[in-house]
A protein has these predicted regions:
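P-loop NTPase Walker
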Residues: 1-113, 214, 297-300, 612
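Conserved helicase NTPase motor core
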Residues: 3-7, 12-23, 27-38, 43, ...
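Short glycine-/polar-rich loops that comprise or flank the Walker A/P-loop
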Residues: 27, 56-60, 87-88, 245-248, ...
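Helicase P-loop NTPase motor core
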Residues: 35-43, 278-281, 286-392, 419-420
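ATP-hydrolysis module of ASCE/P-loop NTPase motor domains
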Residues: 87-89, 108-197, 288, 440-441
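Conserved helicase core region in the C-terminal RecA-like lobe
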Residues: 93-101, 224-227, 252, 375, ...
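ATPase/helicase motor core of nucleic-acid motors
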Residues: 320-321, 351, 363-490, 504-508
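Accessory C-terminal helicase-associated subdomains
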Residues: 360-363, 463-570, 583, 615-619, ...
Length: 651
């Protein structure tokens, strides 16, 4: 079947770049697709073209997607366009699904029993908690365990050497090399493997057993890979092995949208594609069908300053006025109040004109508004306001690890000790993190006296005669601060702990950041007492745990990561301030290491991905502090003033 006949039989509105991509079937092909360029349409249409125009049996094609949801979506779209019978003959899998098949086939061919897959999250968490406690000599919080899991995934997906793993101890705030080694030893002893091991074992099996590799190469001579920029080093290595016989590899991605470095995403594979696949063709899809021209132009100009990328330019297909604006507020709390007012307007529009428009034709109830932010905790003060005002919102991928982060727990434990001075166990957890200057052996004696005599730890310190005059003075000073905490507003209590009780110094000694403490301060500013803040935190944790998703709500809260691949009519980017987004600046680009440059450019990509979610309007919040990304993106900033009652003026 010729192209013209295929077009007539399966009509699709494709531009010239898309048509070229669809018709590029043989040999290695890298398709670089800018945001909103219709890459899924091209992938699905290309599969149909391979089958109907080129006569390739669908059983010979393997399509690799990043998530199970993407697998299901692509299969459904293919079935809708080309029929379910043909769709059922195609193979759509995640890389883990492919590896599970490889391991199963290995066992069947060799007669050996592969390790069983460990998919019980509780068993994994309990095991890692025991290993962490042994290595760190302290109990792991849920946040600590989440960090351990992320680092283990990173190590296995990045194919790190033992030397490189030990180097991670310097920056990981834990003995990750020890934890990693003990965890893997336990897995082997139990004859188990985790999801990341699936890839490690599958890769090893393909390398060591040529017959197994040939079987898969013959089974799938054509490979299509989606979201290649998010694929890890070991995943790319597996794909390269599978494609090495025919080199019929079609890889779709965009290094400008690679934002999963913490999960070991390996965009370098896209940059070195031509080197690794001689004779490769690199195609571009540069037309953005999603966003207004002003958004496209601003975002493209911004990302052009990255250096670790292919040369390409995003172009708009939509006309539109300049709709990229800065909202400059004095404080982060002003930002939250502004967004609460926006949410209230969305709710009113939805309630009054469901499916309709306002009198002036501008307020469509189906209009989607998304607030995008870097981390989940950035949204907590906004969620708090929305809940207080009973304003509806929809949240993507709620995350509650904030409440179990070690710095948050430290502050809460200090508050707890202020309220319960007889709590010797809590005293032992915090005494060395505030300016008591008590030695460990003395702290243990004080705790014992407190428990046996049923008195406060501060009275126990007085009765214990082993403290120097200087230390005793420090203890009395700490006791005074503890008493003051009971009389202060929530935010004042947080500031006292951080700046006057020595906790900031402890953070600096440990190389820890105080960013989460700032969120506590903002939440505390809405409470008349420290006890009120503690109660509100419990309520918020319960809300986030139990909240059901209202899919009809058009006001959405999401991290930028969770918004990837999605689009919204209006987007508000929160906290675009140096130190938050970007988390770190590249102070001296000429002297920056390769790793520093890579990390900074990923920060830029994260901002770029957030900006390109917007279809019609993009607003960027700044809070009076340096905001380099916003300055780069915008040429005509608009300042918003927040009224006394918290209702913003129109930007």
């Amino acid at each position: 079947m010729e192209w013209q006949e295929f077009e007539r039989k399966f009509p699709q509105k494709l531009n010239e770049q898309q048509k070229e991509a669809v018709q590029s079937v043989e040999g290695p092909v890298l398709l670089l697709a800018v945001p909103g360029s219709g890459k899924t349409t091209v992938l699905v249409t290309r599969l149909g073209y391979m089958i109907y125009a080129k006569g390739i049996a669908p059983e010979k094609i393997l399509t690799v997607t990043y998530t199970v949801a993407a697998t299901e979506d692509m299969a459904a779209r293919f079935a809708s366009q080309f029929g379910t019978d043909m769709a059922d003959r195609l193979t759509f899998k995640t890389i883990n699904g492919i590896c599970a098949g490889i391991i199963h086939t290995y066992g069947r061919k060799t007669g050996r029993t592969p390790f069983a897959l460990l998919n019980d999250e509780k068993v994994i968490a309990d095991t890692l908690a025991k290993i962490y406690q042994k290595a760190e000599r302290t109990y792991a919080t849920e946040s600590d365990l989440q960090t351990v899991r992320t680092l283990i995934t990173y190590i296995k997906n990045s194919m790190l050497t033992d030397v490189e793993i030990r180097e991670m101890d310097k920056t990981a705030d834990m003995k990750i090399s020890t934890i990693y080694k003990e965890y893997n030893t336990w897995l082997r002893e139990q004859k188990l493997m985790d999801y990341d091991d699936q890839m490690v074992y599958a890769y090893t099996m393909l390398q060591r057993f040529p017959e197994l590799l040939r079987l898969y190469q013959d089974k799938f001579p054509y490979l299509c890979v989606d979201e290649a920029q998010d694929t890890s080093k070991i995943q790319h290595a597996i794909i390269a092995l599978l494609a090495s016989k025919t080199e019929n590899l079609f890889m779709v991605g965009d290094e400008d949208q690679s934002i999963y470095g913490f999960r070991a995403a390996y965009p370098e594979a896209l940059l070195s594609f031509e080197k690794n696949h001689p004779g490769a063709k690199v195609l571009l899809m540069e037309e953005n069908f999603r966003s207004a021209a002003g958004i496209v132009k601003a975002a493209d100009t911004f990302i052009q300053k990255n250096t670790l990328r292919h040369k390409k330019h995003m172009r708009a297909t939509k006309d539109g006025e300049e709709v990229v604006k800065e909202i400059a507020v004095k404080t982060r709390d002003d930002q939250y109040r502004y967004l609460a007012a926006v949410a209230e307007n969305c709710a009113a529009t939805r309630a009054d004109r469901v499916g309709g428009r306002s009198d002036n034709g501008t307020a469509d109830a189906s209009h989607t508004v998304a607030v995008l932010y870097r981390d989940h905790e950035c949204a907590l003060p906004l969620i708090d306001l929305l809940e207080r005002k009973e304003i509806p919102y929809r949240m993507r991928n709620a995350e509650i690890s904030f409440f179990t982060h070690r710095t948050v727990l430290d502050v809460l434990n200090i508050m707890k000790l202020a309220m319960h001075p007889k709590d010797a166990e809590t005293f032992l957890q915090v005494y060395y993190k505030i300016n008591t200057y008590i030695r460990k052996e003395d702290a243990l004696q004080i705790a014992r006296i407190s428990e046996t005599q049923d008195i406060s730890v501060w009275n126990a310190a007085v009765r214990y005669h082993g403290l120097s005059d200087y230390t005793m003075s420090s203890v009395q000073n700490t006791r005074m601060h503890m008493q003051q905490l009971l009389t202060e507003r929530g935010d004042k209590a947080v500031k006292r702990i951080l700046y006057y009780m020595g906790y900031q110094e402890y953070l600096e000694r440990c190389g820890l950041k105080a960013d989460k403490i700032e969120i506590l301060r903002i939440l505390g500013s809405r409470e008349d007492s420290m006890a009120g803040l503690l109660q509100r935190l419990r309520e918020l944790q319960d809300i986030l745990t139990r909240k059901e998703t209202d899919y009809s709500c058009n006001f959405i809260l999401s991290t930028i990561h969770a918004s990837k691949g999605l689009e919204y009519d209006t987007v508000y980017l929160m906290d675009v301030t140096d130190g938050i987004l970007p988390a770190q600046m590249l102070k001296n680009p000429e002297k920056a290491s390769g790793e520093e440059r890579e990390n900074y450019e990923e920060e830029r990509r994260l901002f770029y991905v957030g900006a390109t979610r917007a279809k019609s309007e993009l607003y960027v919040f700044t809070t009076g502090k340096p905001h380099s990304f916003c300055k780069e993106l915008l040429s005509h900033p608009v300042t918003c003033r927040v009224k006394r009652k918290g209702i913003p003026s129109t930007p």
